Amino acid sequence: MKYTDTAPKLFMNTGTKFPRRIIWSMGVLKKSCAKVNADLGLLDKKIADSIIKASDDLIDGKLDDKIVLDVFQTGSGTGLNMNVNEVIAEVASSYSNLKVHPNDHVNFGQSSNDTVPTAIRIAAVAEVTNRLLPALQQIISSLNKKAEEYKDVIKAGRTHLRDALPVTLGQELSAYADAFQHEHEQVMNILEYVKELPIGGTATGTGLNSHPEFQERVINEINRITGLGFKPANRFRAMRLLTDLLLLSGALRNIAVDLYRLGQDIRLMFSGPLTGLNEIDLPTQEEIAGSSIMPGKTNPVTVEATLLISAQVVGLDHANQFASMLGEFELSMGIPLVGYNIVTQVNFISEALEKMSRLVIDGMVANVEKMKRYAESSPSLITIVSPVIGYDKATEIGKKLNKGMSIREALRELGYSDNEINKILDLSKLVKPGFTAK
C-alpha cells in the first residue's frame, strides 16, 4: 500500500484515528460506487463484486486495524480516501485473484474531494439518527416523568443564587424537558441539510470523469443500504463549504450548554448533606466512594462527568468553526477534522444524555420537607404582599425579615389576621400567576 505506507512520514502521528462510524461510511460509499459503475458498464463485474465484498468487510469492522492514517493529515481527507482505496484493493484482489487497483477501480469516477465530504456527512447522519435522537428522547421522557411526579413539590426559587419566589421542582425540570425537545426538533431540521451529498463532483464539483447519472445512482444505492434518505447536493457548495455540518455542531453545542446547566442545578440541589442545600438524593451516586481519604463521602460523579463532556463538546464546536473557514475556492481544507469532531461530539453528548437520564434523573429523590422549609423561610415571600402595600413598604418589611423577624410577625404589624396570613402564605398559590394578597 504505497500511499498508506508513505503518508505517515508527512502527516501527523498523534494516534488520533478516524472513528468506526466514518470507516463504516467509507465502506458504504465505496460499495455503492462499485455497484453503480458496474451497472453502468464502466467497471468489470468480477472486479466490482470483489470491491463490494471487501467494502462489506470494511462496513463490518473487519478491516479497522488497517485504516491507520491520522486525522491530522491533508485537509481534503485524501489520506483517508487513499488508505481505504488501498485496503479495499488489496482485500478485493485476494478475493478475485485479479489485480484490483486502488485508483483505477476502487476510486473510479471519484476524487477524495467528493468522497470524504460525502462520507463524513453519511457518518454524521447515521450517528445522529442511531444515537443522539434516541438519547434526546430518553432524557425528555425522564424529565417529563419526574416533572409530573414532583409537580406539587414546592421549593425555594433562586435568582443570582439568592432567595426568590417559590417554584415547584416539577416546574424546574419541565424547563429542561422543553429545552431538549426544542433541540431535538432543531437537530431534525438541520439533518435534512446534512443529508445532501456531493458525491459525483470529482475534483472540483464539475463531475468530470464520472458518469452523468453517477451522483443520483450512488445516492440511491446509499439509501438502499442505510435507509437514511440522502439526496443530491449542489456539489460546488458541499465540497467547498461545511456550513451544514457547522450548523449541526452548533446544535450539539446547544445541547451541551443546556445539559451543563441541568447538571449544575442538580449538583447544587445535591450539595450537603449538612452544609449544602440537600434538596435531593441521588442513590446511584452512592455506589462508589466519593473520596479516597474521607470515608462515607459520596459525590455526583455521573453529573460531573457530564459537565466535562459538555465542556469538550463546546470546545470541539469552536474547533469546527475555525476548521470550517479553512480552504479556498473549490475545496474546504478542514474536512477530516470536522468529520472527526462531529462524530466525536455526537458520541460524547449521547453518552452523557443516556447516563444522566438513567443514573441521575430516573433515580432522583426529592427531599420534600427540606424544600418546603426553605421555601417558607425565604425573605422573598414579601413579594406576595407588594401589590397590596406597595413596593416601598414591602422593601421595609423585607429588611425586617432579613434581621430575623418572621413574615407572619411583619404581616401582623400591618394588621392582618392569622386567618388572612394563612391564606397569604399558602405556597401552592405562589407558583402560578395571580395576586394572592388580594
From Swiss-Prot:
State the name under which the record lists this protein.
Answer: Fumarate hydratase class II
Kindly list the biological process annotations in GO that this record carries: fumarate metabolic process; tricarboxylic acid cycle
What residues sit in the active site?
A: H160, S291
Originating organism: Saccharolobus solfataricus (strain ATCC 35092 / DSM 1617 / JCM 11322 / P2) (Sulfolobus solfataricus)
Q: Could you say which protein family the record assigns here?
A: Belongs to the class-II fumarase/aspartase family. Fumarase subfamily.
Which biological pathway?
Carbohydrate metabolism; tricarboxylic acid cycle; (S)-malate from fumarate: step 1/1
The upper taxonomy is: Archaea, Thermoproteota, Thermoprotei, Sulfolobales, Sulfolobaceae
Q: List UniProt keywords, sorted A-Z.
A: Cytoplasm, Lyase, Tricarboxylic acid cycle
Query: Does the record carry DNA-binding as a key word?
Result: no
Q: How does activity depend on pH?
A: Optimum pH is 8.0.
Other information: There are 2 substrate-binding sites: the catalytic A site, and the non-catalytic B site that may play a role in the transfer of substrate or product between the active site and the solvent. Alternatively, the B site may bind allosteric effectors.
Compartments it resides in:
Cytoplasm
Reactions catalysed, semicolon-separated, are: (S)-malate = fumarate + H2O
Q: Where does the entry annotate site (Important for catalytic activity)? A: E304
Task performed by this protein: Involved in the TCA cycle. Catalyzes the stereospecific interconversion of fumarate to L-malate.
Positions annotated to bind substrate: 76-78, 101-104, 111-113, 159, 292, 297-299
Thermal properties of activity per the entry = Optimum temperature is 85 degrees Celsius. At 95 degrees Celsius, the enzyme activity is still 66% of maximum, whereas at 40 degrees Celsius the enzyme is almost inactive. Thermostable.
> A GO molecular-function term, please?
fumarate hydratase activity
> SUPFAM superfamilies annotated for this entry?
L-aspartase-like
Checking Pfam families in the record gives: FumaraseC_C, Lyase_1
Q: Which InterPro entries match?
A: Fum_hydII, Fumarase/histidase_N, Fumarase_C_C, Fumarate_lyase_CS, Fumarate_lyase_fam, Fumarate_lyase_N, L-Aspartase-like, Leu-rich_rpt
Which Enzyme Commission number(s) are listed?
Answer: 4.2.1.2
Indicate the quaternary assembly. Homotetramer.
Cellular component, GO annotation: cytoplasm
